[in-house]
């Protein structure tokens, strides 16, 4: 089976067009983009199109759309990641679905490939989900 996956909820407002063409999506959950309204819209569309729903956390950096490496303490990054994912998960559960996967965004995703400590912070932060969903990694 082929899984066509797409990042959504990032402010382009094209989810209605893209959702029927994909199998799964990564929904921005407040770090680089996304808010309650956009997350809710994306989750509703995902459910209506039977798409797998993923969280798309990032460095907390809306100014640079999560595209730049952010120097942030381990504790602050961990708190941000947990808040981002749990915010989306609450919406998913309220709408009767479940979190299928987690895929980091932008600089966080790319930096983890080269930075073991950052990777460990990320994995520790999302460890609560290890038996519940898939992890899309670099």
Predicted features by range, described:
Residues 8, 45-47, 51-65, 69-70:
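Glycine-rich nucleotide/cofactor/substrate-binding loop typically near the N-terminus or early
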Residues 8-10, 31, 59-61, 103-108:
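Active-site-proximal loop/turn and secondary-structure-junction residues that shape catalytic pockets
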Residues 16-22, 41-54, 93-96:
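Acidic (Asp/Glu)-rich catalytic clusters
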Residues 27-32, 111-112, 130-138:
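Catalytic beta/alpha-barrel core
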Residues 115-121:
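Charged helix-capping and loop-helix junction motifs
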